[in-house]
Regions:
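Short glycine-rich phosphate-binding loop at a beta-alpha junction
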Residues: 42-50, 130-141
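Phosphate-coordination/substrate-recognition cap region in phosphate-metabolizing enzymes
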Residues: 32-97
């Protein structure tokens, strides 16, 4: 899983759901940095959010010609909190988080979890149909809160489990299995040798970046 590169609103900490902000130059650089890493990996399928920040990241990473749009990979619908920072929201709702309170006129974690489950079902079906030998690999390009929710859902924690998982712009997360157990193989990493995409030789590292 790959979070899109930096945007102006992400850098300002503004909740960026369906507002279609473009990548900053630094966000495009983050996306291009993925290309040499991913070129060595045979993906059976590539899915991307149709929002331009994710789609452009996918293109710059080298998959624009083969990516399939997936509306369920779109970021949370933040409703009335679109474009608003957490600090601003907490002036009226102390302790607010997207995980605990949801978004008026938008989505809550239960609604997002339904979308995450649909993405997982689609990904598993694509993996089962992959002609590549060995374990199938799929690439998903999306957004911070959505991909965190997806990881939580994969692990059986529900979308709310994403509260425990930070994913910076341009960050990488790898979901997979240890035997039959669903696990995180890598989390919040940045471009590195291809072997680490398999969860070896070391776990994910990296400091969180600001933004939603």
């Amino acid at each position: 899983m790959f979070r899109h590169g930096a945007t102006d609103w992400a850098r300002q900490g503004r909740h960026t759901g369906r507002t279609d902000r473009p990548l900053l130059p630094e966000g495009e650089a983050e996306a291009r940095a993925l290309a040499p890493l991913l070129a060595a990996i045979p993906f059976g399928a590539v899915l991307t959010s149709p929002l331009q920040r994710a789609r452009r990241t996918c293109e710059l990473a080298g998959f624009g010609a083969v990516a399939q749009p997936c509306s369920d990979l779109m970021e949370w619908d933040y409703g009335r909190w679109e474009g608003i920072t957490t600090a601003e929201i907490r002036r009226t709702i102390p302790g607010w988080t997207v995980w605990s309170h949801g978004c008026p006129d938008g989505e809550d974690k239960a609604m997002v979890e339904q979308r995450c489950s649909a993405v997982i079902e689609r990904a598993l079906a694509l993996a089962a149909a992959s002609p590549e030998p060995g374990p199938a690999r799929l690439a998903l390009f999306g957004h911070g809160h959505l991909l965190r929710s997806l990881a939580g859902t994969w692990l059986g924690l529900g979308a709310g489990g994403g509260a425990l998982l930070v994913l910076g712009t341009g960050g990488i997360g790898v979901l997979g299995y240890e035997r039959e157990q669903r696990v995180l193989l890598r989390w919040n990493g940045w471009p590195a040798p291809a072997a680490t995409m398999e969860g070896r030789p070391e776990p994910a590292s990296g400091s969180p970046l600001p933004g939603q």
